[in-house]
Amino acid sequence: MAAFVAMLGLIDPALRTAGFGAFAIAAASAAAARRRGAGAVVVVLALASAGFVIAAAVRPEFRADTRGYYVYLRSIAFDHDLDFANEWTAWGLPAAPLTATGLRHNPFPVGPALFWFPFFAIAHLYVLITHALGLRPWAPDGYDLPYLNALAAGSISAVTAGGCLLVRSMAGYLTLRQAAIVVTGAILTSSIAYYTFVVPGMAHALTFALACFLVWAWHEAERAPTLRSWSLLGLSVGLVALTRWQGLVVGLLPAALAVQQLRQRAVRPRWIAAAAGAGLLAFLPQVVVWKLLFGRWLTMPQGPGYVDWSSPHLADVLFSADHGFFDWTPVMLAGTLGLLLLLPSMPTFAGASLAVVAATAWVNGGVRDWAANDAFAARRFDLAVPFVAWGLAALGRVATVGLRRRPWTVVAAVLGAFAIWNVGFIRLYRARAFTDAAPFERLAAAQARQLYRVLDSGAARRGPRARSFVHGFMVGEYFHDNVNPFGTIDVGALDSPWLADGWSAPELREGWPAFRWALYPRACVLVPLLEPRALRSSIRVRAPARIPEQSMRILSNGAVVATVPVAREWADVAFTVPAENLVRGENQVCFEFGRSLPGEANGSNAAAVALIRLP
């Protein structure tokens, strides 16, 4: 019951506080149950509850390809068809082209919609009840927020269950605690964290979860081959492919086991046939949808030429700063190499796992948009993460051999540090600081800046001295002392370290100085000072010609110090920042604007700014 309330706290943001309370109850119940030696179900529910409250706090986004996956669910549930024209219209999107059957084209698989359906049904029931009682504003039409948040609930539940199965697959190789450390680390240091909590309406969290199911089923079939275990293994392959057709490469794993057990006479051919049948049966919904949409039982839904099977970008999808698997998520490289350590003791599993990772890289390297548009990290390696987790398990065992006291605490600390890095990277990605390439030098600087912000925020609660100490430790640069002796900020420069939020990219126009647009409603600069003193300052600024009357409020650390008009010609506007509105360490001077002009790129240009002087 507590887990259900926590899920409702995710589905309806108004119940977020109740969701946090429900998680506390679920966690306490799980702890008490474990002390009594109760089963694992209560722990799984508590973990799912934790995922629900994390997602509720993060506030999932429904962007990128989310609509392409969700439209199946909405259209089948409400319209009882696969005609997506009304959904595209409702979302304000251009109509997709017609297929050979006269329906709207949709290249995305149907599998995720089928897995999300139970959670979608719960959200629909909730919306129906609250709408009938007049308690909430949601309309029972499949478009409102509870329906979309239900996708997050489904993805979190799947990742929780899949992660637990992956932990169970490591029984006998690691203890429960050690396996939990490894699996949690693999999730939090990979793109799976992003696609579970931030953009859960895509296939990647589900693909990861089903690949975990596959790994568990493989170990069950390897340990005790039976008709049932082999059927589950085949079913898992079909389910992975149902969520993403590229997931067919996981079939290399049961193929390797079949060869091994046929040689050992440990498996009957009809069991393998049953596995193949189960896989085909699981994949059948996708085949039916392709037939209805495209008029073919089997097709390349993205169109001919989508994959170049020579894989010209194989190295890029692994090592490029533009969404490379090992570049954006370096722990994945460690885990992949760790699979080599498994070869002596588990040659079939380790060899097949390496083959799956390699095949995934080969396919991804041949895809037309190999870097994947609007993607955090190498999202198409979702199915490889469970295998990488096994490599991390092997690496952890080897690394802890020479450690006597709490060796796995060290492993947890290392994975935790990389998880913090990954969470910081996700935050930067959400802020659009990095969208395509993420050069390490810039990324490291941005991460350090975020760390400083966190420490500065904590120090602010303890007073000016604490903030000054943090600034001196993390930055140590001060205007008029050891950097920027004249206090001049060249706003139009290509690289201006003193700009904070609210600025466009630099621009050049004939007859204008180099400048940036200050974006509505606010643009800020950073002013580090060794000692606060009054700053008689000026800003070279002009309003867009199409804004007849622009006003600008100037604030120092949140306090208004001046309100001035902004002319439609370049002018140096003078203002004074009083000493009492400044502190030792970093200060933030902001410029707030009354009106904005939609621009070509960002839609919120408020004023052009070329230079700020704070002498």
Question: Residue ranges of each PLM-predicted region?
Answer:
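C-terminal luminal/periplasmic domains and tails of membrane-associated envelope-modifying transferases
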Residues: 2, 10, 15, 442-615
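Membrane-proximal envelope and lipid/glycan-remodeling enzymes
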Residues: 1-487, 491-493, 502, 507-510
